[in-house]
């Protein structure tokens, strides 16, 4: 069996797969759609993250493809319906990076509320700290609205509460008891 890795993934993934099949990693990560189409013909397993899009053209070029392993949560970059029609199984990794995404969300909230990016730029360009130019606001006591309260949204809410924020959330797909 042949496996093609088309994005930066943990070396442990390639090492583990290498025990069972011939593993190749694209020279350019991620490859362009045309490069992928040219190199996917005899591949059985495709390991990727989000680029390039796996559409009908790519799937038709993949004559032997049996499995697409996605090292992320979302599958909106793959024509999953057509993959299923062709007998290609598509797997993702729910929860893989949820905590990292939630932490980054809180980080961006802090950057915006504390003006850290423009303050850093001012210090590096002007070589001085103007403590009055970048007065920020605390997160404590603020209300955070979360649209979509799946794993990541719930984790953002947990972290925000630690900062003393009130969290309100909406998700049409979850039962009411999730929000209490």
Predicted regions and their residues:
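Rossmann-like dinucleotide/phosphate-binding beta-alpha-beta segment
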Residues: 132-180
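N-terminal glycine-/charge-rich "phosphate-binding" loop or analogous flexible N-terminal tail
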Residues: 1-43, 164
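Rossmann-fold NAD(P)-dependent oxidoreductase module
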Residues: 16, 104, 108, 155, ...
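Rossmann-like adenosine-cofactor binding region
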Residues: 41, 54-59, 172-180
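Phosphate/diphosphate ligand-binding glycine-rich loop within oxidoreductases
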Residues: 44-124, 136-140
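Structural signature of beta-strand start/N-cap positions in the alpha/beta core
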Residues: 2, 66, 89, 142-145, ...
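Structural/interface elements that position substrates and couple domains in central-metabolism enzymes
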Residues: 2, 12, 22-24, 98, ...
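Short gly/ser/thr-rich secondary-structure transition/capping motifs
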Residues: 25-31, 49-50, 123-132, 178-180
């Amino acid at each position: 069996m042949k496996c093609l890795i088309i994005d930066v993934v943990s070396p442990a993934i390639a090492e583990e797969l290498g025990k069972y099949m011939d593993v190749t990693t694209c020279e350019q990560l991620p490859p362009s759609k045309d490069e992928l189409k040219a190199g996917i013909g005899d591949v059985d397993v495709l390991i990727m993250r989000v680029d390039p899009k796996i559409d009908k053209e790519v799937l038709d070029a993949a004559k032997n493809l049996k499995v697409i392993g996605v090292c992320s949560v979302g599958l909106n970059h793959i024509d999953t319906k057509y993959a299923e029609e062709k007998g290609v199984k598509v797997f993702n990794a729910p929860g893989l990076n949820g905590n990292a995404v939630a932490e980054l969300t809180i980080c961006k909230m802090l950057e915006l509320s504390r003006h850290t990016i423009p303050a850093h730029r001012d210090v590096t360009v002007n070589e001085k700290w103007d403590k009055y130019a970048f007065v920020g606001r605390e997160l404590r006591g603020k209300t955070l609205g979360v649209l979509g309260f799946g794993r990541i949204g719930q984790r953002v809410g947990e972290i925000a509460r630690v900062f003393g924020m009130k969290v309100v959330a909406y998700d049409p797909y979850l039962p009411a008891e999730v929000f209490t």
